[in-house]
Design a protein with these regions (language model features):
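Short, surface-exposed, polar/charged, turn-prone segments marking secondary-structure boundaries
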Residues: 57-60, 89, 160-164, 182-183
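Residues immediately flanking
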Residues: 137-138, 158, 186
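Solvent-exposed beta-hairpin/edge-strand motifs
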Residues: 149-162
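C-terminal beta-strand-rich structural cap/linker in extracellular carbohydrate-active enzymes
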Residues: 167-186
Length: 186
């Protein structure tokens, strides 16, 4: 569905989508092979959009892609590990979600379209953190977001995801790379 994109751009979009799915509330669902940039092509090399009745050649998983796309595979592992580690990504009720998730506003916290940013107030949900910020940038350029508080630990960026702190941002303004997700914890 994006024929003019480079492989690097497709991988960035894959990471962005995985980040959205695995930081969202509710049950996460990932198709088999997404973590290896799985595609389904027919015998002529054309992309098969609906492979339900296609052959095993189209539908099988090519495990050698796990080696080729090791960085993407590790990114998925990191997102899954982060989701398991922090209960704030897995609230139990609609009321709990409404009470503890607060969306940042365009014109106040950021100026771009195609951006979603929210803070999870985790202090009553998760003993491991006070707050989690999730910023989703679908733009083709980097954007700045004002989080209103400083001293955040970056856990997910455009390259890395997991339970290890990537960097600490002392300022309240956070830069988010193009076509990426950033998750910060305090």
């Amino acid at each position: 569905s994006t024929p003019n994109c480079t492989e690097e751009e497709l991988i960035a979009m894959n990471k962005l989508i995985a980040g959205i799915i695995l930081t969202s509330q509710g049950i996460s669902f990932v198709h088999a092979g997404e973590e290896m940039a799985r595609t389904k092509e027919d015998e002529e090399g054309k992309l098969v959009e609906n492979s339900f009745e296609s052959s095993d050649k189209v539908n099988k998983i090519y495990w050698d892609r796990k080696v080729k796309y090791k960085d993407l595979f590790e990114y998925y592992k990191g997102l899954i590990s982060l989701r398991k580690e922090y209960k704030a990504f897995r609230m139990n009720t609609n009321e709990e979600i409404k009470e503890n998730i607060h969306f940042l506003k365009k014109g106040v916290n950021f100026s771009e379209n195609n951006l979603v940013a929210y803070i999870i107030d985790a202090k009553n949900i998760d003993i491991k953190c006070e707050k989690i910020a999730v910023i989703i940038n679908a733009n083709n350029k980097d954007v700045d977001v004002e989080l209103e508080e400083s001293n955040w630990h970056v856990m997910v960026d455009e390259k890395t995801a997991g339970n290890e702190i990537i960097e600490t941002i002392k300022d309240s303004k956070v830069n988010v790379s193009r076509k990426s997700i950033k998750v910060l914890i305090k």
